[in-house]
Amino acid sequence: MVVDADKKELICSFCSKKQHEVKKLIAGPAVFICDECIDLCTDIMKEESKVALKQITASIPTPQKICKILNDYVVGQDKAKKILAVAVYNHYKRLEYVQSGNNDVELNKSNILLIGPTGSGKTLLAQTLAKILDVPFTMADATSLTEAGYVGEDVENILLRLLISAEFNIAKAQKGIIYIDEVDKIARKSDNPSITRDVSGEGVQQALLKIMEGTVASVPPQGGRKHPQQDFVQLDTSNILFICGGAFMGIDRIIRSRTNHSSIGFAANINIDKEKNNNEVLKSLEIEDLTKFGLIPEFIGRLPIVTTLEELDKESLITILTKPKNAIVKQYQKQFELDDAELVIEYSALEAIAEKALVKKTGARGLRSILEHLLLDSMYKVAELKKQRVTLTKEVVDGLIEPVMTSIISTKLNKKQQMIEDIPA
């Protein structure tokens, strides 16, 4: 016990001030601390938190820099890139503002909803953001989620994945980003009330509301269902940014129906509207269309930023095949190079591959499977033969002939012989 030897008066163990010199003196096991030292310690911890947060925000690129990096990997979708870049940047500026203790204006979190057809780049945008940002990031599939108490995955497991991504550093996880894919699959199944619970639709939306808005969630570190006796980790989701994505198949019909019925001259407008492609129709998206699709108003309210991605055309698909840093053609050419072989794809073949993907309506996602199918036999052979050049032509893509394989050595010899023959006698 710390006591002044002269007056037998209690003193602070840290600053040695006497009890009568301070407002409060709090006792611990054989030690005391005064209110002034407590305030000082609190200020020090706040300052350290600010420094840690500034280190995070300082490492976040500006929106223009984020867009520039996204352009290296994602083709097109300029509007979506801009919205994502600004949202991510503002998210971390908001954290810095909240941490500063300045409460004159309350800044709310702005989660994001990405709507676009399959293979338009929703998931790739999120994955690329994960590479750009030095913050914890995780992806989840909404189709595997169910309401608590039913067979399936609880929404708290999404937070567990974020914790794992942050190596169970709670402070880092609370500043992370969560991408929920296929969110359109948890739309309410019907507008009519039913005697059976919609545990994988509206029930999941209800379960996601709290964690998206901001709450202190109890996260089971070993998974929720197999270890019921474990201690839970408390995770504050107030500063976690949620990005949701989905194809929302059929929402274009809902938009067309609304715009037709709200116009004068019904029959004429149907003909005009039919001429619009889905990219143009999605630009007219309203909140009521999402409600009609099956998202509950409370869930939509947690996603204030809504943007649409355009369906990719043939030129965009060809660009995706060849231009980005991680372009699919570049990846396959590198694989052939590792086998001491070459892969040559003619432009007409690239056009045919893009057209196939458009017919299948798989977007960019289907390009790899098409190439994998075309090159399977060639990859099987070149590992043994070596020094081979494999050429893909339009006829190969159309299934008329097999990929053309020639020896690189013989090709070089033929060129050398041709050069000798061309030399004047």
From Swiss-Prot:
Positions that bind ATP: 117-124
PROSITE patterns, A to Z: CLPX_ZB
Database matches in Gene3D superfamilies: 1.10.8.60, ClpX chaperone, C4-type zinc finger domain, P-loop containing nucleotide triphosphate hydrolases
Listed GO biological process terms: cell division; proteolysis involved in protein catabolic process
One cellular component term from this protein's GO annotations in UniProt: HslUV protease complex
A Pfam family per the record: zf-C4_ClpX
Molecular function per GO: ATP binding; ATP hydrolysis activity; ATP-dependent protein folding chaperone; protein dimerization activity; unfolded protein binding; zinc ion binding
The ClpX-type ZB domain, residue ranges: 1-53
The keyword Nucleotidyltransferase is assigned to this record: no
Domain of life: Bacteria
CDD domains: RecA-like_ClpX
Keyword set includes Hydrolase: no
UniProt KW keywords: ATP-binding, Chaperone, Metal-binding, Nucleotide-binding, Zinc
SUPFAM superfamilies per record: Glucocorticoid receptor-like (DNA-binding domain), P-loop containing nucleoside triphosphate hydrolases
Entries under HAMAP family matching the protein: ClpX (MF_00175)
Self-association state and partner proteins as the record states: Component of the ClpX-ClpP complex. Forms a hexameric ring that, in the presence of ATP, binds to fourteen ClpP subunits assembled into a disk-like structure with a central cavity, resembling the structure of eukaryotic proteasomes.
Role this protein plays: ATP-dependent specificity component of the Clp protease. It directs the protease to specific substrates. Can perform chaperone functions in the absence of ClpP.
Record family assignment: Belongs to the ClpX chaperone family.
Protein name: ATP-dependent Clp protease ATP-binding subunit ClpX
